């Protein structure tokens, strides 16, 4: 959640953290799903992609390379929506460079 917040991305829901059955109706509002651990949630993400056309990212953001790849996938999906909504495209290169500069 911290990484997404620093990237300017609002989180719709984190399941099952603090989840209620009533909140499930809001799941299709998300632009994409994140499955940081393939053992948990991958089947739901695949279902959401088939049912709602909602893409997902299944990269675990651990380590420099995977985190940079994770952010690149987010950038790609956010910019896909930005193009559809005629909004400004994002570039997270500076963020990735800044986060990995001293490692």
From Swiss-Prot:
GO terms for molecular function: 4 iron, 4 sulfur cluster binding; ATP binding; metal ion binding; oxidoreductase activity. Its EC number is 1.3.7.7. One of its GO terms (cellular component) is chloroplast. Keywords: 4Fe-4S, ATP-binding, Chlorophyll biosynthesis, Chloroplast, Iron, Iron-sulfur, Metal-binding, Nucleotide-binding, Oxidoreductase, Photosynthesis, Plastid. It is found in: Plastid, Chloroplast. It comes from the Eukaryota. Its main location: plastid. Pathway: Porphyrin-containing compound metabolism; chlorophyll biosynthesis (light-independent). Pfam families: Oxidored_nitro. It catalyses: chlorophyllide a + oxidized 2[4Fe-4S]-[ferredoxin] + 2 ADP + 2 phosphate = protochlorophyllide a + reduced 2[4Fe-4S]-[ferredoxin] + 2 ATP + 2 H2O. The keyword Nucleotide-binding applies. Gene3D superfamilies: Nitrogenase molybdenum iron protein domain. Signal peptide: none annotated. Its cofactor is [4Fe-4S] cluster. It is an enzyme of class 1 (oxidoreductase). One of its GO terms (biological process) is light-independent chlorophyll biosynthetic process. Binds 1 [4Fe-4S] cluster per heterodimer. The cluster is bound at the heterodimer interface by residues from both subunits. Component of the dark-operative protochlorophyllide reductase (DPOR) that uses Mg-ATP and reduced ferredoxin to reduce ring D of protochlorophyllide (Pchlide) to form chlorophyllide a (Chlide). This reaction is light-independent. The NB-protein (ChlN-ChlB) is the catalytic component of the complex. PANTHER family: LIGHT-INDEPENDENT PROTOCHLOROPHYLLIDE REDUCTASE SUBUNIT B (PTHR33712:SF7). Protochlorophyllide reductase is composed of three subunits; ChlL, ChlN and ChlB. Forms a heterotetramer of two ChlB and two ChlN subunits. Belongs to the ChlB/BchB/BchZ family. This is Light-independent protochlorophyllide reductase subunit B. The lineage of its organism: Eukaryota, Viridiplantae, Streptophyta, Embryophyta, Tracheophyta.
